[in-house]
Amino acid sequence: MKLDGSIAAVVTGGASGLGEGTARALAAQGVKVALFDMNAERGEAVAAEIGGIFCAVDVTSDEDVAAGFAKARAAHGQERLTVNCAGIATGQKTVSRKREDGSLRAHDMASFERTVRINLFGSFRVLSQSALGMASAEPMADGERGLIVNTASVAAQDGQIGQAAYSASKGGVYAMTLPVARDLSSEGIRVNTILPGIMWTPMMAGMDQKVQDALAAAIPFPKRLGTPADYASLVLHLAQNVYINGECIRLDGAIRLAPR
């Protein structure tokens, strides 16, 4: 896929973090970008800066996702690239003790379900609706109709203590990559997944610098946190290399997460 002004893209979670970095990188190539996010103020600002459009979308809502694609396609035409970056990170042990009195409690099921609903169901909802549109488009070079890039996490393979819900949600994204790529192969639609390691995102900004430095020191090489630019660079490569399909790629500086 040649990334230029003939290509339209949708980036979920595009108002911040990995999604924003990807949206900016695509726009720099001339790609017409639609941002799906719930943060309207930030999303509108980023869209204005990159010459894209913002669509207020909650990925857990069928109606929001359908309306977002309708708005994006009306403005830019059928997207050929969709990047799923919307997601949340949560932490709670399967069974834990309260610090106050040592009493036991089980993992909150509402929190578990919400994590899976956003990270896994949300990714598949966007993926399937984008693929539906791509399948109706005319093939490009090599017979390709489009590419969908999902975001899992190294926690899908190296889940830490307290990451049962998060690892399950990202593990689902990881596990569905190959079967979905096979499902869509006859339509000329590729599907790949990126498993980011410890990345600098707005969630990191509130952490003490010493904590950030310690996290960076644990990474074999390069000894720094990953950046949205690192992620975006891989998205661009996946778009341009048509032979990469059905793959889950770790982007982590060779780190393997310890139990805690």
At which residue positions do the language-model features occur?
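Canonical Rossmann dinucleotide-binding motif of NAD(H)/NADP(H)-dependent dehydrogenases/reductases
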Residues: 2-34, 180
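Residue(s) in the substrate-gating loop at a strand-loop-helix junction
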Residues: 153
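C-terminal substrate-recognition "lid" of short-chain dehydrogenase/reductases
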Residues: 227-251, 256
